[in-house]
Every structure is written in structure tokens, then in C-alpha cells.
């Protein structure tokens, strides 16, 4: 009988802990977290929570098969971390840079167009998931890519060691 009471008390404590601490452990989508660079001139934009969540959904739909967790399966040395995006030519660490890339992708050094091998609006005939994406959708996806490092830290683009 005592064992049953102890297990019941433990289960009750775990349930209470989950209800009280569950939301405290979740990432807060504050305006600071949702504020990301708009362009390379230093302007910023604050996404709405709805934009961020839509970007996350669209990223899962159109991008995550190759970029799950911010990595690049086809080229592990190029991830979606902010630092990596900033070093690209042209820089892709802002909304406009990422949207431009999703329209017409180029190599990391910016020398060659790679629309034939990387999904983009330009190659929507080859990559059907890109067909129905609008400019608004691309902004939401770019916003998601730029917000994730603020939420996940080193896990975003960190690879297998974090999953």
C-alpha cells in the first residue's frame, strides 16, 4: 500500500512540475527575438509570431529535406548559421539576401548560378515545392532561418552532435 502511495505522489509531483514549468522552458518569442536584419545596410524588421510560425511551417515543407536543423546535407561545411550566411558573397544574413538567394541561388562565393541543383523560384519547374511560394512566403522562410539561431543557439546548424 505504501508503494502505491509513493508512486502516486511521484506521479502527481511530475504532473504538477510539467504544468508549472512546461511553458517556462519554451522559448519566448519576444520582439527582440523576432527582430532580424532586413538588409545589408543595417535596417531591421520585427516579424510577427504568425510570420515566424508560417516561415517555420514553410521551411519544413520546402527546405527541411536538405536543411533539417540548419545543416546542409549536400555540403556539411555550409550550414545556415548566421556567421556562415554573413560570410557568403553576397551576404545572406538578412531577409533580402535570403529572399534573393531563394529566387536565384548562387555558389557561396557568388560566382556561379546554381538554380539547376538548388531549389529556387527560378527552378520551380525542376523543384515543384517552390512553385506556389510567394514573396511573402519567402520572407517568412528567411525570417525563420534568421530567428532559429536566437532560439536554438549552437543547435541550429550544429549537426548530428545536437540531435
UniProtKB/Swiss-Prot annotation:
Protein keywords: Electron transport, Heme, Iron, Membrane, Metal-binding, Photosynthesis, Photosystem II, Signal, Thylakoid, Transport
SUPFAM superfamilies the record matches: Cytochrome c
Membrane topology recorded in Swiss-Prot or TrEMBL: Peripheral membrane protein
GO biological process, one term: respiratory electron transport chain
Bound cofactor: record note: Binds 1 heme c group covalently per subunit. PSII binds multiple chlorophylls, carotenoids and specific lipids.
PROSITE patterns registered for this protein in UniProt: CYTC
Keyword Repeat in record: no
Pfam family, one: Cytochrom_C550
Phenotype upon gene inactivation: Cells do not grow photoautotrophically under low CO(2) concentrations.
Residues noted as binding heme c in the record, renumbered to the chain: 67, 118
Any single Gene Ontology cellular-component annotation: plasma membrane-derived thylakoid membrane
Stretch forming the signal peptide: 1-26
Molecular function per GO: electron transfer activity; heme binding; iron ion binding
Cofactor: heme c
Family the entry assigns: Belongs to the cytochrome c family. PsbV subfamily.
Function: One of the extrinsic, lumenal subunits of photosystem II (PSII). PSII is a light-driven water plastoquinone oxidoreductase, using light energy to abstract electrons from H(2)O, generating a proton gradient subsequently used for ATP formation. The extrinsic proteins stabilize the structure of photosystem II oxygen-evolving complex (OEC), the ion environment of oxygen evolution and protect the OEC against heat-induced inactivation. Low-potential cytochrome c that plays a role in the OEC of PSII.
Subunit composition and interactions: PSII is composed of 1 copy each of membrane proteins PsbA, PsbB, PsbC, PsbD, PsbE, PsbF, PsbH, PsbI, PsbJ, PsbK, PsbL, PsbM, PsbT, PsbX, PsbY, PsbZ, Psb30/Ycf12, peripheral proteins PsbO, CyanoQ (PsbQ), PsbU, PsbV and a large number of cofactors. It forms dimeric complexes.
Protein's name in the database: Photosystem II extrinsic protein V
Lineage, highest ranks first: Bacteria, Bacillati, Cyanobacteriota, Cyanophyceae, Acaryochloridales
Gene that this polypeptide is encoded by: psbV
Amino acid at each position: 500500500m505504501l508503494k502505491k502511495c509513493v508512486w502516486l505522489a511521484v506521479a502527481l509531483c511530475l504532473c504538477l512540475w510539467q504544468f508549472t514549468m512546461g511553458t517556462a522552458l519554451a522559448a519566448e518569442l519576444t520582439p527582440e527575438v523576432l527582430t532580424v536584419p532586413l538588409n545589408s545596410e543595417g535596417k531591421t524588421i520585427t516579424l510577427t509570431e504568425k510570420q515566424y510560425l508560417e516561415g517555420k511551417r514553410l521551411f519544413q515543407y520546402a527546405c527541411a529535406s536538405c536543411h533539417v536543423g540548419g545543416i546542409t546535407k549536400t555540403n556539411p561545411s555550409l550550414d545556415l548559421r548566421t556567421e556562415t550566411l554573413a560570410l557568403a558573397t553576397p551576404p545572406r544574413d538578412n531577409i533580402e539576401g535570403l529572399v534573393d538567394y531563394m529566387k536565384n541561388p548562387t555558389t557561396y562565393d557568388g560566382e556561379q548560378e546554381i538554380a539547376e541543383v538548388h531549389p529556387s523560384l527560378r527552378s520551380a519547374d525542376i523543384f515543384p515545392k517552390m512553385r506556389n511560394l510567394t514573396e511573402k512566403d519567402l520572407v517568412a522562410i528567411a525570417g525563420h532561418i534568421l530567428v532559429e539561431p536566437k532560439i536554438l543557439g549552437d543547435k541550429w546548424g550544429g549537426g548530428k552532435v545536437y540531435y
